[in-house]
Amino acid sequence: MFEATATIDNGSFGTRTIRFETGRLAQQAAGAVVAYLDDENMLLSATTASKSPKEHFDFFPLTVDVEERMYAAGRIPGSFFRREGRPSTDAILTCRLIDRPLRPSFVDGLRNEIQVVVTILSLDPNDLYDVLAINAASASTQLGGLPFSGPIGGVRVALIDGTWVAFPTVEQLERAVFDMVVAGRKVDGADGPDVAIMMVEAEATSNVIELIDGGAQAPTETVVAQGLEAAKPFIEVLCTAQQELADKAARPTSDYPTFPDYGDDVYYSVASVATDELSKALTIGGKAERDARTDELKAEVLARLAETYEGREKEVSAAFRSLTKKLVRQRILTDHFRIDGRGITDIRALSAEVAVVPRAHGSALFQRGETQILGVTTLDMVKMAQQIDSLGPETTKRYMHHYNFPPFSTGETGRVGSPKRREIGHGALAERALVPVLPSLEDFPYAIRQVSEALGSNGSTSMGSVCASTLALLNAGVPLKAPVAGIAMGLVSDDIEVEAGDGTKSLERRFVTLTDILGAEDAFGDMDFKVAGTKDFVTALQLDTKLDGIPSQVLAGALSQAKDARLTILEVMAEAIDEPDEMSPYAPRVTTIRVPVDKIGEVIGPKGKIINAITEETGAQISIEDDGTVFVGATDGPSAQAAIDRINAIANPQLPTVGERFLGTVVKTTDFGAFVSLLPGRDGLVHISKLGKGKRIAKVEDVVNVGDKLRVEIADIDKRGKISLVLVEEDNSAPADAPAAAPADATS
């Protein structure tokens, strides 16, 4: 058994210890590592590879799975069969966090199936497992003898009291204004060893605005850039520990066959026949027209080279795509113009409108160029919040953001149905962007479901979803703390030959940052950088890069460029709606009241009898929390008020007095009399001797039955609070009508 340890020093915030161990568990896997975070957190990562390649695949078949075991938290799964089922959202998002830096680290052209399975064995509820899983997956892959350019280190850093803290606990995150997951690897830079950042997933916390108001540092673009730099030393320590383990226990790298997308001879032939016409086609502004022309050219090239490269049609197609990529990048780097004619900082045409779906509680349509997003908001009682049964710290989710990407959004056919990992990831990104500006439960006692429908896609539907969702939430009457917009940035870089004044030529590394990237620019560029935020600070950020590091000044420039675009988009959104609308008449009106905790049982009643009766009779929905908070919802005010009055009558009763008169309902008959409901939870007895109006009766049911209305007066209240009633003659003065209580079992 071999071990390696990384110590994370957070100064006054203490230290965290990450320990990697191999040789004890999963010995038949190509590479297996047990990773520990301090003493309480333990997970196993196992990497395996198929023996033969999938030659017919035109992609790298890497699969990452995260298996949450509920025994890790000492719990039995809540499902019907009491065993784990489909992966939770947290597990799926962790799979994506692992996949994004791992995939580009394998050699190009690899077609053997690679599977990484991470199993959560033990978890302290005060810790998160996702970042530990990134390191474990990298370490196990490093040991497996695979063509892998790792190791990769992953760290979560949170801005707490002005300090970037690595591997923060859940408790510490409550004091953070911003946290980010950063993954990267060690490289040799121009100025010595450095860390190349490969992936970033970041967000402002839910209480960021309150913390800023209290004097905390706002997560501006400058602060976020500082956080990325602060993560690098921690990543270096983690990579060093993984490399130490690999030096002791890694298998020799096996000779895996690779399948290049095309041969050099194919590329030269395609370039010679297609460059001129393809360059012209790539200046067409409209996506549909441009795609149609490039498809036509591709067909011509395939036909022209069919005889020369018979049986190598896939290589011709791949070479045509590579030529397209080269021409797109070349025009950006040399001319600073893009395939749709825009400059590098130009945003496509924007439009925004609200109230586009008639009966929805809130809706909006946001369009940026050919990317079109429909946002729809639904409000409901807090009890409709999502119940979460996973290893994460969240047990309920009040704000749920769901993203749908149907195939027609790109003019194609395909499968529809349950969401894929990409859709779950995009929905989670948009959700994180909006959570920091949502009103508190006290200010807005609703569960909120936000759905983003991608109706048209040509670049960054996730950031379009952020914009459409802000508009729809405001249209639904949700009092957001600030509007949020998002934009996708891109980066193109290359070594460009430049000529000096003396005529000498040299290569110069040139970076060009693009604002509002198209789908093609995303595919052909070096970076996908999505930034969402308010006019004052960043709320969410996602970065994926194919480069071995991005210079700090380039990244800072991209963040600044993104803010300029965000402010422009916010202005367009404000023209459509700049403050919350009145709530839809179809949305429930939810009111919050409080009752004493010791009265909760009385409000609910035996087997829910009282609360069910109030719900049935008033039409209101009622939800009671353990702390005595009661949410009452109804589509009209009178129904909600009637339910509130009934609840208050039980929880905060005003005791009736002798002489008061009521119109009550008979709720129970006995041999000795009839019990009449006066107020919710408050009954009185009309003795059998008082029912006959002076005449003797043999049986109570001969005079009254359950459900009958009786006008009664309180004749006496004994020391135990039991109420004796007498009938009131019809010609007497009118009694005080009280709302009838829900029938309740009375005791003699």
Swiss-Prot record:
CDD domains in the record: KH-I_PNPase (cd02393), RNase_PH_PNPase_2 (cd11364), S1_PNPase (cd04472)
Binding locations of Mg(2+): D522, D528
Domain S1 motif residue range list: 659-728
SUPFAM superfamilies: Eukaryotic type KH-domain (KH-domain type I), Nucleic acid-binding proteins, Polynucleotide phosphorylase/guanosine pentaphosphate synthase (PNPase/GPSI), domain 3, Ribonuclease PH domain 2-like, Ribosomal protein S5 domain 2-like
Keywords of the record: Cytoplasm, Magnesium, Metal-binding, Nucleotidyltransferase, RNA-binding, Transferase
Major localization listed first in the record, in broad terms: cytoplasm
Catalysed reactions listed for this entry: RNA(n+1) + phosphate = RNA(n) + a ribonucleoside 5'-diphosphate
Sample GO molecular function, one term: 3'-5'-RNA exonuclease activity
Transmembrane segments: none
Top-level lineage group: Bacteria
Domain KH stretches: 588-647
Pfam families on file: KH_1 (PF00013), PNPase (PF03726), RNase_PH (PF01138), S1 (PF00575)
Enzyme Commission number(s) of this protein: 2.7.7.8
GO annotation terms (biological process): mRNA catabolic process; RNA processing
Record InterPro entries: ExoRNase_PH_dom1, ExoRNase_PH_dom2_sf, GPSI/PNP, KH_dom, KH_dom_type_1, KH_dom_type_1_sf, NA-bd_OB-fold, PNPase
Localization in the cell: Cytoplasm
GO terms for cellular component: cytosol
NCBIfam families, alphabetized: polynuc_phos, pppGpp_PNP, PRK11824.1
Protein name as annotated: Polyribonucleotide nucleotidyltransferase
Organism for this UniProt entry: Mycobacterium avium (strain 104)
Gene assigned in the entry: pnp
